[in-house]
Amino acid sequence: MSLTDKELFELNKKAVTEGFKIKPRINYTPVGGVNGPLVILDNVKFPRYNEIVNLTLPDGTVRQGQVLEVRGTKAIVQVFEGTSGIDVKKTRVEFTGENLKIPVSEDMLGRIFDGSGRPIDKGPKIFAEDYLDINGSPINPYARIYPEEMISTGVSAIDTMNSIARGQKIPIFSASGLPHNEIAAQICRQAGLVRPTKDVHDGHEENFSIVFAAMGVNLETSRFFKQDFEENGSLERTTLFLNLANDPTIERIITPRLALTTAEFLAYQTERHVLTILTDMSSYADALREVSAAREEVPGRRGYPGYMYTDLSTIYERAGRVEGRNGSITQVPILTMPNDDITHPIPDLTGYITEGQIFIDRQLHNRGIYPPINVLPSLSRLMKSAIGEGMTRKDHGDVSNQLYAKYAIGKDAAAMKAVVGEEALSTEDKLSLEFLEKFEKNFISQGAYENRTIFESLDLAWSLLRIYPKEMLNRISPKILEEFYGRDREQDDDEEEEEDPDKSGDKLIDA
């Protein structure tokens, strides 16, 4: 006897959840009231916080909700699919007695889901290996391992100067109109470990996976991500969760938690290294504010709830490495700063929780530089544990420090030039201006499909630093300077002679 897909799915669900305590379910009708995304229920027996509720509408459609608040026999439920069309008198409500769980499996790689975890790629339902609570399990702080070993993104400004450690959480601060979606897609295409390590479960490329969650994106952006991942072959190792702008706002509250639960399964049960990208966290915070306003809570700064810091931490702190497990979760949340304001509550609170930030700059974008990453306000607090001999290259730390110093001096020289003119500048200031121009055009700027290894980026950095005489590179140790400054100059001289044997003068190449 052949079974339908629906029957197989139900059998699988029953088998996976066997042993769970089954409680009788109680139905309630009518609904007490509707307020925005919330449904208020009266005379409820034993409601539980975070319990999942099924609402059956008069036309037979079923929507899911979650208990947000319990006051005696009254329960306040947030409905994930929105409250439009709910008839107060005819809607039937059923309390399931369970928290919201997501079916997880390795088969989720290469699949696309909506913001509630339902497949939208016309593929079959997921046959679950397990059902996991989307709020995750608390991790013993003592069991956490310090993040180390670098994740390569193929972007020079990130890999060389703001290296991301495996298990780190580092946000991208962007703003509306800036190419953060393109940068996110490029990171997904190019991300991987710098080298296979001895302690991983599997040294092959398949051991590195990506979980991508988009919240409040429009159809054009959604199509861009799906098409980009499919065309470049990165979809095979990626799980996508897409909450569109026309989807219910309330759904955005569970989308990042679904993504992180999937990431935890892949990292801690299949021992993969998972890069989790969440965009746009500003849409998530706005959904949080909407629910808070509907519950008539006392607002905090700019109308956001006072507990937003705590709520954001329940998402960001789910990154890291755990003792006894070879997998890791690295988080790169992306948020758009309203009015380019870095003091806005969303980037402000995010910066307190996370371990650095990557700053997308509008001025660089307006000058046609891609990716427009401003390295001066950017920071990776765990960079020191991810670079150096044995992990990248022994000159990495010194080169990064020197690039920061010379770029800052170049910015000062450009500001001085605007005041006094180029003729009044010293020789050192003119060198700094030359470095500034070539650093932005050749080092920060790169193609959207250009994947630079960390070694190519470091060699490119040396070719720029050789604009200065050796004695002016005061952030690099003499030993490193002796080994790399001369060697790289000789290599570049040889390359230039091959390209143009008759050329004389400055041997610096604009790589």
UniProtKB/Swiss-Prot annotation:
Stored HAMAP family: ATP_synth_B_arch
Primary localization class, coarse: membrane
Lineage, opening ranks: Eukaryota, Fungi, Dikarya, Ascomycota, Saccharomycotina
The annotated regions of Acidic residues compositional bias extend over 491-501
Described purpose of this protein according to its UniProt entry: Non-catalytic subunit of the V1 complex of vacuolar(H+)-ATPase (V-ATPase), a multisubunit enzyme composed of a peripheral complex (V1) that hydrolyzes ATP and a membrane integral complex (V0) that translocates protons. V-ATPase is responsible for acidifying and maintaining the pH of intracellular compartments.
User: What is this protein called in UniProt?
Assistant: V-type proton ATPase subunit B
What's in the GO CC field?
A: vacuolar proton-transporting V-type ATPase, V1 domain
Q: Which domain of life is it from?
A: Eukaryota
Localization in the cell: Vacuole membrane
Q: Which residue ranges traverse the bilayer?
A: none
Pfam families linked to this entry: ATP-synt_ab, ATP-synt_ab_N, ATP-synt_VA_C
Q: Per the record, where are the segments of Basic and acidic residues compositional bias? A: 502-511
UniProt topology in membrane: Peripheral membrane protein
Source organism per entry reads: Candida tropicalis
Q: Which GO terms describe its biological process?
A: ATP metabolic process; vacuolar acidification
Q: Where does ATP bind?
A: R381
Kindly give the InterPro entries that the UniProt entry links to this protein.
ATP-synt_VA_C, ATPase_a/bsu_AS, ATPase_F1/V1/A1_a/bsu_N, ATPase_F1/V1/A1_a/bsu_nucl-bd, ATPase_V1-cplx_bsu, P-loop_NTPase, V-ATPase_su_B/beta
Quaternary structure (record): V-ATPase is a heteromultimeric enzyme composed of a peripheral catalytic V1 complex (components A to H) attached to an integral membrane V0 proton pore complex (components: a, c, c', c'', d, e, f and VOA1).
Similarity comment: Belongs to the ATPase alpha/beta chains family.
